[in-house]
Design a protein with these regions (language model features):
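Conserved small/polar residues in nucleotide/adenosyl-binding loops
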Residues: 276-283
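A cross-family structural signal marking well-folded subdomains
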Residues: 1-178
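Betabetaalpha-Me/HNH-type nuclease active-site subdomain
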Residues: 133-271
Length: 287
């Protein structure tokens, strides 16, 4: 780290002493005001709330932080709250797609560094947002892994291969399922008034249990092959507030709905939708 800073000093990109510490304080203030306790000064309440919720979900539930330096760099240069929301939307898309695509930490650093390079080169904040998914600097064009964001079929393939996996719940140490469910839940809010906080303990629950009792209705209605195929898929997962209840997790359908979902869904939009749908289709054929 010392060697890296010495390079920055020697080529004039940083100055030692008070100037350096002022720069640190400036970035610290941006980090606090736009990431830790985000405030967005724009008239559009829904858009401002979207930034607050999305930045919170990313900071708390993405298991990496390489997306943060580009956001700090963008705001430090342009100080535009309105466009910062648009920037974060695209930044989150990039972070999620490349996480699904299996980028390593080194590959993420290289990928997000390209955005910082673009910010350094551009004096137009809208230009940065328009080009941030496709930009590669001339010297880096042949270096590092790149996803072509202009090819819809490439993006759809990444999404399909990830979201439809039968072991989806277990991906990335079980972190991806929680993040994707929270993102889907966020999109179900109108964000005009009360906004989701997602500050309590968030649990991912299986509707069809992972380990149903041999004499349960789950075993009667789903053979082993079907259970293996569906139990860890995205469509079998819902969000709950609070810690897991291992006993309730294996209850039969009606009791599970009453004891588990109906008491713990209040902070989420999608869980009651799943509950209502399942109650409406509670038959031998559809359950």
């Amino acid at each position: 780290l010392h060697e890296e800073y010495e390079k920055l000093y020697s080529d004039g990109r940083l100055k030692k002493g008070e100037t350096f510490f002022n720069l640190i304080y400036k970035y610290a203030d941006i980090y606090k005001s736009k990431i830790l306790s985000p405030e967005i000064n724009i008239r559009n309440e829904s858009k401002a709330n979207r930034y607050k919720v999305l930045s919170h979900i990313m900071r708390k539930y993405l298991p990496f932080s390489e997306w943060i330096p580009p956001l700090l760099a963008f705001y430090e240069k342009f100080y535009d709250d309105e466009l910062l929301v648009d920037f974060l939307d695209k930044l989150e898309k990039k972070a999620t797609i490349e996480w699904m695509a299996g980028f390593t930490s080194t590959e993420r650093v290289t990928s997000f560094s390209r955005i910082i390079k673009l910010i350094d080169e551009s004096d137009d904040s809208r230009d940065v947002i328009d080009r941030m998914l496709t930009y590669t600097s001339p010297e880096a064009r042949e270096r590092g892994r790149v996803i072509d964001y202009t090819k819809r079929e490439e993006l759809e393939k990444i999404l399909d291969l990830t979201l439809n996996r039968k072991d989806f719940y277990k991906l990335k140490g079980r972190k991806m399922a929680k993040y994707i469910l929270l993102r889907l839940d966020m999109e179900a809010w109108d964000l005009e008034g009360v906004i989701p906080q997602y500050t309590e303990v968030v649990t991912v629950e299986h509707i069809l249990p992972q380990n149903p009792s041999p004499n349960s209705e789950w075993v009667r209605k789903f053979d082993e092959e079907t259970r293996v195929e569906w139990v860890n898929k995205l469509g079998n997962l819902v969000l709950l507030s609070g810690n897991k209840n291992s006993r309730a997790a294996n209850y039969d359908f009606r009791k599970k709905m009453e004891v588990y979902f109906s008491r713990k869904w209040t902070h989420f939009r999608l869980t009651p939708v799943s509950y209502t749908h399942l109650r409406a289709h509670e038959t031998e054929a559809d359950l």
